[in-house]
Each structure stands twice: as C-alpha cells, then as structure tokens.
C-alpha cells in the first residue's frame, strides 16, 4: 500500500475511525495496485482526514482511516470504485476481515 502515514495527523476530536482488520489470501492478484488506488481515492473524498496501516509477518493487517463524520464514511463505502474493490476483496484477497466504526472522543500522545 502506498505509504500511509505511520502516525496519522488528525484534528482535535470528535471524529470517526474506520478500523479494517484483515487476513490476506496467498498471492497478490492485483491487490497492491488496488490498495494503492483505494488510499489515493480515499484521500480525495470529502471528510477524509488520514489513514494508518500495518501488516504483520503473519499476514494480519490493520488499516485505520479517519473521517470527519458518519456521512463521509457512508459516502466512501458507497463509492463505486470502492465497492468494486470491496467485492474483489471478499471474493479474492481476504480469507477473513472485520470492519469496525468508532467515534474518537479523545486522543493524546507524544
């Protein structure tokens, strides 16, 4: 995936986090190209704030995208190109996945 920020820079809360946890199937089959495109496209969407993504050696991946509001998340989920990627993911790229949406009420760090 094209270099998402390792530690996302977000505005002061509240905002929303979409947490996508997945385990990949074997082989690329166009995955990296599509993942790069989805990050590029998400960054262009109204309400998009940032994205962070990590993948472990065991294939477990956690991608967190941050959004200004629920309407922006819904619009992204319904985006035609994103829906195409979702279908391909369910059919080809993911052996397992879970999506969670959370309201960030507080954040802090160094």
Predicted features by range, described:
Residues 89-92:
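Short, conserved catalytic or adaptor-binding loops enriched in Gly and charged residues
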Residues 1-61, 70-78, 94-110:
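Short S/T/G/P-rich N-terminal loop/turn motif that feeds into the first structured element of a domain
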